[in-house]
């Protein structure tokens, strides 16, 4: 069946099943001594999956398998970690993607990504590690990730009642929806960069990606009745995750400026030119905008979005972005917030993630979300490569 599940007649039933499955997911403890290498291997798997044209759900499942396997077993060497990472990707592709897209071992070994690291995986090593992974997860790879929920929520992401900047109706629903989808998938990739997102259920992360995208596109209301009905989440429920995503977005913009400044400093007499970074915010079509407003009052686009979002969230608690009962919040309210007049925030162009197959992939984000939260001794139930 070629029809995606989220467009089928049983989409609601599949969504309910995934929501039930995510409640049984194990807790991520962040106990691996090689956790500091996680971002590097996330980049490796991202590059490999894009090189092999794998679907997002396969990439997200591969990284989920890697994270939780590292969390349970004592992986002590980079060779072991490379072996497990590649095996996770191949196993996830077999489970999530079409058969004709599953990469061959030779294809993986011949990529510049691995050959530049002097790494090669044999068929015997792959088979042994795949069996080890399957046993570690009790032969159950039906593990929901944010990628499994996102497309279902995107179906309700735009409506004819949406307004831009709280006043101007959207001019073209089709183009706006395309741009929101691009933004949402951008935020979905951002969630791979930090294990803090394991604090949230996958469906919460996916819904937050849609909410953050609507905030960046200045669509009002930030969270619609349709989105609340489809996801069963209120704006308050998603507030913490959305804010983390917007902080990450702000750091990406700052990194782009830093990369541009460093590049210009290295080339004498060079003129200003657009900087290219691993993650770039997406392009979206020109929307009807109010008269020009002085932007000097703002510190940075994402900071303004966070403040405006918090302000609207506070108004939502007193009477509502959404009419009717939105249900109890799982998060504590924000402190008293200063009102902020909304105005269009310029968003840099092009999101096409330019992840060049380089000799040594760079980390995509430099944001820190308080790693002290994941402190404690390293405890492991078993060694995964013990003879």
From Swiss-Prot:
It comes from the Eukaryota. Residues 13-142 form the Cyclin N-terminal domain. Keywords: Cyclin. SMART domains: CYCLIN (SM00385), Cyclin_C (SM01332). CDD domains: CYCLIN_CCNJ-like_rpt1 (cd20528), CYCLIN_CCNJ-like_rpt2 (cd20529). InterPro entries: Cyclin, Cyclin-like_dom, Cyclin-like_sf, Cyclin_C-dom, Cyclin_N. It comes from Mus musculus (Mouse). This is Cyclin-J-like protein. Belongs to the cyclin family. Cyclin J subfamily.
């Amino acid at each position: 069946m070629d029809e995606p599940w989220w467009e089928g007649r049983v989409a609601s039933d599949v969504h309910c099943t995934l929501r039930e499955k995510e409640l049984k997911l194990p807790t991520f403890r962040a106990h691996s001594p090689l956790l500091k290498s996680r971002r590097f291997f996330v980049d490796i798997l991202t590059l490999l999956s894009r090189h092999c044209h794998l679907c997002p759900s396969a990439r997200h499942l591969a990284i989920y398998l890697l994270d939780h396997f590292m969390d349970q077993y004592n992986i002590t060497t980079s060779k072991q970690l490379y072996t497990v990472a590649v095996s996770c990707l191949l196993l996830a592709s077999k489970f999530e993607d079409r058969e004709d897209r599953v990469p061959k071992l030779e294809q993986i070994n011949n990529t510049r990504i691995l050959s530049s690291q002097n790494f090669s995986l044999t068929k015997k090593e792959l088979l042994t590690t795949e069996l080890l992974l399957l046993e570690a997860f009790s032969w159950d790879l039906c593990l929901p990730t944010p990628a499994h929920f996102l497309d279902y929520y995107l179906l309700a992401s735009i409506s004819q009642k949406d307004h831009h900047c709280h006043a101007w109706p959207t001019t073209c629903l089709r183009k706006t929806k395309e741009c929101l989808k691009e933004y949402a998938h951008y935020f979905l990739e951002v969630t791979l960069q930090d294990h803090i997102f394991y604090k949230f259920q996958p469906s919460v992360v996916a819904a937050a990606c849609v909410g953050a995208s609507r905030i960046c596109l200045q669509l009002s209301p930030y969270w619609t009745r349709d989105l609340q009905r489809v996801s069963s989440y209120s704006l308050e429920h998603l507030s913490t995750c959305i804010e983390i995503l917007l902080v990450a977005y702000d750091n990406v913009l700052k990194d782009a400026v830093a990369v541009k400044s460093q590049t210009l400093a290295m080339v004498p007499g060079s003129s200003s030119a657009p900087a290219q970074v691993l993650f770039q915010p997406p392009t979206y079509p020109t929307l009807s905008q109010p008269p020009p407003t002085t932007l000097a009052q703002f510190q940075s686009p994402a900071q303004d979005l966070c403040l405006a979002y918090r302000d609207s969230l506070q108004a939502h608690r007193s009477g509502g972005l959404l009419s009717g009962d939105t249900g109890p919040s799982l998060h504590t309210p924000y402190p008293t917030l200063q009102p902020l007049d909304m105005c269009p925030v310029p968003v840099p162009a092009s999101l096409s993630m330019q992840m060049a197959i380089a000799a040594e992939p760079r980390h995509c984000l430099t944001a820190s979300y308080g790693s002290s939260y994941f402190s404690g001794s390293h405890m492991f139930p078993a060694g995964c490569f013990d003879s």
